[in-house]
Amino acid sequence: MKTLSVLVLCSLAVLCLTSDASFSSQPAVDTPAQEGLFVEQEQASSVVRQAPKELSLSQLESLREVCELNLACEDMMDTSGIIAAYTTYYGPIPF
C-alpha cells in the first residue's frame, strides 16, 4: 500500500511539473494584436470578399463584341461560352 501511494504521489508530481513547463514555455501575451483579434488586410479582404454578381445582358454583349474581333476567341465562345472565352484570351472580366 505504501508503494502505491508513493507511485501516485510521484506521478502527480511529474504531471504537475510537466503541465507547469508547458505553461511557462509560452510567453505571456498582453496585446490584443498578438492574441489573434486582428488579421492582415489581405486575409480580411479574402474573407469578406463578396460573391461575384451575374453579368447583365449589356455587359455580356460588350464582352461578345470584344471577343468577336479575335477568330480563336469567337470559336471558343461558340463552344465554351462567352465568359470562358473572354477570360482565356483577355484575362479577368473588368466589371
Curated annotation (Swiss-Prot):
Which residues bind Ca(2+) 2 per the record?
65, 68
- Please, one GO biological process term? response to vitamin K
| Disulphide bridges | 67-73
The parts of the chain that form a coiled coil are none
Matches recorded under SUPFAM superfamilies: GLA-domain (SSF57630)
Q: Where is the signal peptide?
A: 1-21
Locations listed in the record: Secreted
Residues annotated for Ca(2+) 1 binding in this entry: 68
The protein's GO terms of the molecular function aspect are: calcium ion binding; hormone activity; hydroxyapatite binding; structural constituent of bone
Q: Which residues form the propeptide?
A: 22-50
Question: Per its UniProt record, what PANTHER family does this chain match?
Answer: OSTEOCALCIN
Q: Give the record's family classification.
A: Belongs to the osteocalcin/matrix Gla protein family.
Question: What is the protein name given in its UniProt record?
Answer: Osteocalcin 1
Species whose genome carries this gene: Solea senegalensis
Q: Highest lineage ranks of the organism?
A: Eukaryota, Metazoa, Chordata, Craniata, Vertebrata
